[in-house]
């Protein structure tokens, strides 16, 4: 079993039960899924760029990404409806915990001038969004093979009802929030 999943079953559940006075273990918020999205605007001119992004996302998450397509045509961006413009991966279960563990313990500390992640990035429904400016912080990415530095969005979807519950859940997992 994964290290973070074990930690959730033993420590985190207990801590949250005490803090929020839940009557049942089933009320304790859990992480539902993690969505990693990479928007590739350059793919409009050059479709090879998207292939690189898909490859990198697959290395990072260990799962084949879904290529996202444009919903509308936007003339100023030279964009037609249905053009591939990004890639996303939805992680659940074992892979989700592995990715979160890697993100918290390896990748985030590798960010330059890292002071912690923002406490304000919750959406009001208990979900947390995190923007990463470069894919090089992940250990799977080889610095020499990177054609262009790209960022990505990481959304952690929880079953928590409030932001406070979600913040406490992620803090118990070891998410480095800013002081």
UniProtKB/Swiss-Prot annotation:
Disulfide bonds listed in the record: none
Coiled coil: none
GO molecular function, one term: tRNA binding
GO biological process: translation
Subunit structure and binding partners: Part of the 50S ribosomal subunit; part of the 5S rRNA/L5/L18/L25 subcomplex. Contacts the 5S rRNA and the P site tRNA. Forms a bridge to the 30S subunit in the 70S ribosome.
PANTHER family for this protein: 60S RIBOSOMAL PROTEIN L11-RELATED
Protein name: Large ribosomal subunit protein uL5
């Amino acid at each position: 079993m994964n290290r973070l999943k074990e930690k959730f079953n033993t420590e985190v559940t207990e801590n949250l039960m005490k803090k929020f006075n839940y009557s049942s273990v089933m009320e304790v918020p859990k992480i539902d899924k993690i969505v990693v999205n990479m928007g590739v605007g350059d793919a409009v001119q050059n479709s090879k760029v998207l292939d690189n992004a898909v490859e990198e996302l697959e290395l990072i998450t260990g799962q084949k990404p879904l290529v996202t397509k444009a919903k509308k045509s936007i003339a100023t961006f030279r964009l037609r409806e249905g053009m591939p413009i990004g890639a996303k991966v939805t992680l659940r279960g074992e892979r989700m915990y592995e990715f979160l563990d890697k993100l918290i313990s390896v990748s985030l500390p590798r960010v330059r001038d890292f002071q912690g992640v923002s406490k304000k990035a919750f959406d009001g429904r208990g979900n947390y969004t995190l923007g990463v400016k470069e894919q090089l912080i992940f250990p799977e990415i080889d610095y020499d093979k990177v054609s262009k530095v790209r960022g990505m969005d990481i959304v952690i979807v929880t079953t928590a009802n409030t932001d406070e519950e979600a913040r406490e859940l992620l803090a118990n997992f070891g998410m480095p929030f800013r002081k």
